[in-house]
Amino acid sequence: MNHVGRKCSMSAIVGTTNAGKSTLVNVLVGQKVAAVTPKVQTTRVRMHAVSNHENVQLIFIDTPGIFSPKTKLEKFLVKHAWMSLKGIENVIVLVDVKNYLNQHLKKIIDRIKHSNLNAILVLNKIDIVHQSIVSEVIEYMYSLYKFSKAFTISALYGIGIDKLVDYLCETSPYGPWLYNDDQISDAPLKFFMAEITREKLFITLRHELPYSLSVVTELVEEKEDNSLIIKQVIYVTKDSHKTIILGKKGEMVKKISMESKSDLENILQVKVHLFLFVKVREFWQNHLNECVGYAE
């Protein structure tokens, strides 16, 4: 690989829960690499997503939303979020324009003040508010911290993304690429598979289901016809949650399985045989090996 003239940078995307971090990462990369749901705290672990633009490789670190941790799982997530700020060029502070008066956002800013990182302000969801509100939020955010640059976007509709990418490409330092040309993430395949199913669960069940569930891909087996057998376990903390996921006569879990199967086949370009199992484990949140989406 010829490194001459190449540029590479790493940017961590931080923000409060449900600010749109995973949606932004997927748009920047051009493929689904992180779960996108209406639920808060759906990103379990930090993940590197890769986007190449001619001679520039942009690496984005999708982080768990930073909030006040209580359980062992939540403390694990927040620790990983702050670990993402080590050894990077930029920190992108993603702000939901309808939820900018947030105490956790102030805590994030206070932490960044002591990091000496190039902090970029990105206001998301501008498609749902008036321009006057956007200006008000920018003014407020700059009263908290002097950001190097500010951008306004709608990650959902792709508004303003090009300007953000152009800036990141322009300011990236010269250096070799860290990932191959065709690589879009450093997450294991089993993790990707679990993320797809977890997204379908949250989107389908929305307010009926808490975020305290985990999907673990326990088996991926290739058949002679090149199709894949995928077995996943959905861990929940209560019998009532299991009942919700299964649905009447198993119709709900069948629906989720079909939707996840469809996405997996589109992404992997192979036929998929997906088997979902729902298990109750009251304190699964204290078993960190089951929080990352895959089993070795």
Curated annotation (Swiss-Prot):
One of its GO terms (molecular function) is ribosomal small subunit binding. It is found in: Cytoplasm; Cell inner membrane. Residues 15-22 are annotated as: G1. Residues 205-282 form the KH type-2 domain. GTP binds at residues 15-22, 62-66, 124-127. Residues 62-65 are annotated as: G3. GO terms for cellular component: cytoplasm; plasma membrane. HAMAP family: GTPase_Era (MF_00367). Monomer. This is GTPase Era.
